Design a protein with these regions (language model features):
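C-terminal substrate-binding subdomain of Rossmann-fold SDR/epimerase-dehydratase oxidoreductases
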Residues: 1-125
Length: 125
């Protein structure tokens, strides 16, 4: 299996599990706060590190990576500063990246094993 990676994979990001995103957003909607605020995770990871986590979860020994250095890779590092949301809404993410990826992987495994499953919905970016 080969995975296309835009850039060298060393760019860092923070990811937020959907349940945490919904909880933070609902808490914001229910509050009186009306200024911009970050709802995110403090857990920062490189794309290469995330691929390694996915390899471990999936049981794949090592995916071949096709580093596409000519593709846009965005900023070198991006992470959410969540100090304000913690202070104003008393909210913080709960789901660690590894746990969220495992839940997502398990869900996709169930969905793709169903007879007549439309696999293309999992392969588009």
């Amino acid at each position: 299996d080969t995975m296309d990676v835009w850039g060298d994979g060393e760019q860092t990001r923070s990811f937020l599990y959907i349940d945490d995103c919904i909880e933070g957003t609902l808490r914001l909607f229910e509050s009186d706060y009306s200024d911009p605020i970050n709802i995110g995770s403090d857990e920062q990871v490189s794309i290469n590190q995330m691929i390694k986590i996915i390899e471990n979860i999936s049981g794949v020994s090592e995916l071949k990576k096709n580093y596409q250095l000519d593709k846009p890779k965005g900023v070198r590092g991006r992470s959410s500063n969540n100090d304000l949301v913690k202070k104003v809404l008393n909210w913080s993410f709960k789901m660690k990246l590894k746990e969220g990826l495992k839940k997502t992987y398990d869900w996709i495994s169930v969905e793709t094993s169903k007879v007549g499953s439309n696999l293309s919905r999992f392969t588009k970016s």
